[in-house]
Amino acid sequence: MSSKESCGKKETSQRKDTTTSSPNFGEKDKKERKTPASSTSSSSIRSVSSEKRKLKSDHTDVLYYNIKRRQGLKRLSVEIDTLRRRPKIGSSSQRPIKLKEASYSNDNQIILQSPSSNGTKKDIHKCVDFKPKDIKLTNAGSKLDHGIKSLSSPKIASDVKPKAEGQASENKWSHLLVQREKMKELKKGRNSKFRDNSEKCVLEKWKRNQFSQDYNSNKIIKEPLGSRRQKISFKIPIKSRDTLQKLVEENVFNIDSNNSKTKQEEREYLESSQVSLNVTRQKTEHLLSDFTYKRTVHEWKRKHHYDHQESNDSHSRENLTQSFEAPCCSVSSESIQDADQEMQIVEELHAARVGKSVDLPGELMSMEIDLEDDVHSSSANNTSDRKLLIVIDTNILMNHLKFVRILKTTEVPGFDKLVLIIPWVVMQELDRMKEGKLLKRAQHKAIPAVHFINDSLKNQDRKLWGQSIQLASQKHYGLSDENNDDRVLKCCLQHQELFPCSFVILCTDDRNLRNKGLISGVKSLSKEELSAELLHLSLNTDVCHQPCIPKQQLKAETTPLKESYKEESTNSGLSILLESIVSDLEKSLGTGLSSILETEMKIAFGNLWMEILYLKPPWTLLHLLQCFKKHWLAVFGLVMEKNLLLTIESLYKNLRKANKAVDFTTVKFLLQDSRSLLHAFSTRSNYDGILPQTFAQVNNLLQTFAEVKTKLKPNSSENTVTKKQEGTSLKNSHNQEITVFSSSHLPQPSRHQEIWSILESVWITIYQNSTDVFQRLGSNSALTTSNIASFEEAFICLQKLMAAVRDILEGIQRILAPNSNYQDVETLYNFLIKYEVNKNVKFTAQEIYDCVSQTEYREKLTIGCRQLVEMEYTMQQCNASVYMEAKNRGWCEDMLNYRI
C-alpha cells in the first residue's frame, strides 16, 4: 500500500473521530486519561496490528504525511475553538436558564438535545435574559489547554502511529508538539483580539438598544389604548422565546471560523434586544395599569363634573372604590323581608348623607344667581292660589313610588291643587343610585323613580315641580349645607317663603330628618302618617302660616263648594285607602308565595332550582305570579288542581290593573283571589308556619276593605241611585214606583257579594271543623291540641261533616251542569237554610241563581267544587282508618251509617 493511500485512510479515520457527537467525545477523553503516555504491551500490540493495515515504514512518505497532517490539525483547531466556546455557555450555570446542547448534521442544522442524564427533554419557560456584564471571556486559555490535552491523549497516538520504528514515531511526536505550541500562541493572540472586539461591540449595542428602548416607550405612550395592546401582543409572543434561544445557540455552535465575529455580534445584539424587550414590557404593563386607573378616574370626574374641588379628590376616589363593593343579599332577605330592606335603604341613605358621599359641588352652593320671575314667583303673588306642597324625599320615591303616583292625582279638599316637589339633591341621589354608585342593591328601585320624574316633567305636569339649580345654589337663613338632609330641609323652607299662603309638608321615612323639620317649623310626616292625614284634612285646617284671606271671605267662597269638596274628599280618601290595602297585600302575599315557590322548586329540582327558576330574586308579587305560571305544568300542576291556574291568572291581571289605576272592584277581586290561592295551598302544607300568618293578614285586609266599603260605598251608591232616579224621571215620569223600589234595595253587585260571602263562610266552617277532626283521629293525636275532647266525639263529627259535604257537592254539581235551571239551585238553598250556621240567610233561591249565573262567580264555584271533592276524599280515608276501631268499641250503627 502506498503512502498516499495510507494517508488518505488516516485522514478518513481522523475525520470520523472528530465528527462524533460531544457526549461520546467526553466519554472517550475519560478513558484516555486513564491510559499512560507510554503504551503497554497489550495496547502497543493492538495499535501495531491496526497500523499494519494502514501505514508503511517508508521515510519518503513521512514528509507527505506531515503536510496532510498539518491540514488535519487546522481542521482540528476549528473543533478545538468550538470546544473552547462550549464551556463558556456551560460555565454560566448560575444564570436563570440553561441552553440545550446541540449536535450537528451534515447539512449544518442544529439538533437540540437535553442536558439531563435521563434523556428527557426540557422546555425553556423563561425568557433568555443576557446582560452585557455577564459576557466574560476569561479562562479561555486554560479551557483551550484542557481541550488540547484531551486531544493529545494516547487515542491520537494509537490512530497515527506508523508501522515504522520508534525513531520515526519520536520525530513525528516532536513535530506534533511544535505544532501544538504554535497553535497555542496563535489562539492566545486571537482570543485577546476577540475579547477586545467583543467588549467594544457589547458597549455599542447596549447604547444602541437603550436608545431604541426609549424610542419604543415614547411611541407606546403616544398610541391609543386599543392599538397599543395589539402591538404589545404582536411584538412579544410566547413563541419568540424559542426563536431567540435558537438564534443564540446557532451563534455559539457555528463551525464557520470566518463568520465567528459576525455571529458573536448578532448574538450580543439579540441579547441586548431581549433585555430591552423585557424592560419595555415591564414599562408597558406599568403604563397600561397607570393609564387604566387614570381613565377610570377621568370618567368618574366627567360624569360628576360638578365636583371639581381639589381638596376632595382623594375623598372622591375612596367613595368611588367603596361604591363598587356592595354586598349581595340572600334570597330570603330579598324576597321576604321587604320592610327590613326599606329600613335598610333609609339607614344607608342617611349614613351616606351624613358622610357627605353625595355632596353637591362647593362652587355651585356659593354662586350668586339672580332669579328670574318664573311661574313659582308669579303664582306666589296670587292670594287666591292655595296649594298643598309636599316635598318628597328619596326614600319615599324608592320605597313607595306607587303611593307617590296616586298622591299626584289626589284632590285634597281646601286646596286649589296638590303639588309634589322634588329637591335638587334628591335627583342627584337618584342619579347615583341608578348607576349603582351609592346603594347598589337599590338600583332596581331608583330607575323607576327616575322614569316617573322624567315622564312628569316631560309632559309638563303641573302637579310635580323640581327644585331648580338656582334655588339649590342659594343660601337660606345662613345654612351651610353640611349634608343632604339640610339641603332637603332648605328646600322646604324656601317654598314656605316663596308661597306663604300654601301649606308645606315634608314626606320622608328618615326619622331624624323629620325631627329636624319639626324643629325648623316644617310639618314632617312619614308615608303612613301622610296617608292618614290626607283623609282628615278639611276646610277648617289652617292653610296659611299667616292668613292671607279674611275668614268671612273664606267662608263665603267655601260655602257653595262644600259638595264638590266632599266628593273630592271621598274619591281621594278611597284611592289612598285602596292603595294602602294593595301595598299591604303585595307584601303579605309576596311573603307567602315566595315561601311556596322556593319550597316546591327545591322539592322538584333539588339544588338546581335556582338555575331553572324563571325569574331570579329579588321578586315582586308580579314576578312571583309569573314564576307560578311558567312552572305550573312541571311543578305546581302535579300537586295542585289545574283550575287553580285560573286564579293565578286572574290575580296577575288584576294586579297589573291596580298598578296603573286602583279602583274598588279591582281591589276586591285581588283580596278574594289571594285568599282562595292561599287556602288551596294550605291543604298541602303550612310551609314552615308562613302560610297561616299570610292567610291571617289577608283576612285582616278583607275586614279593612269591608269597613271602607261600609263607610264610602253607601254615599256613592246613594249618588248613583239618585242619578238613576233623575234619568228615569225624565224619560218615564209616569212610572215613579220603579225608582222607589230600586232605591230600597242594594245594587245588584253588592247583593251578589253578600251571597258569595255566605258560601265562603260555609267553606271556612267545614275546613276548620275537619282540621280539628283530623288532629284528634290522627296517629299523633296525643302530641297535637284539638278542640274536640274525645275520640268518639271526633268520630261523630266526622260523619256529620261527610254528610254536609255530600249535600253541598250535590247542589253545586247540579248548578254547574250544562242545562241547569232555576230549580237546580233549590238543593243548595235548602242546605243553607237547614244548618244553624246560616240562620242569617235573607235571600231567595232566585237571587242565588242570578249570582251563580255570572261568569265570575261560576268560575269560583267550579274551583270550590274541586276543593270539596278533595275534602270528601280525605274524610273518607280518615273514616276508613278508624272504622274498625269504632266497630270494636260497639258504637251505634246509626252513627256508622253516615259513612255510606
UniProtKB/Swiss-Prot annotation:
Q: Could you tell me which residue ranges the PINc domain spans?
A: 388-515
Q: One Pfam family, please name it.
A: PIN_4
What ranges does the record give for the region Disordered, renumbered to this chain? Answer: 1-54
The UniProt entry, under SUPFAM superfamilies, shows: PIN domain-like (SSF88723)
Instruction: Name the residue ranges with Basic and acidic residues bias.
Output: 1-18, 26-35
Q: Which InterPro entries match?
A: PIN-like_dom_sf, PIN_dom, SWT1_Regulator
Name the organs or tissues of expression.
Answer: Expressed weakly in testis.
Highest taxon listed in the record's lineage: Eukaryota
Give the compositionally biased regions (Low complexity).
38-48
Q: Which residues form the signal peptide?
A: none
Among SMART domains, the record links this protein to:
PINc
Query: What GO terms fall under cellular component here?
Result: nucleus
Recorded family membership: Belongs to the SWT1 family.
User: What is the protein name given in its UniProt record?
Assistant: Transcriptional protein SWT1
Protein source organism: Homo sapiens
What gene name does this entry carry?
A: SWT1
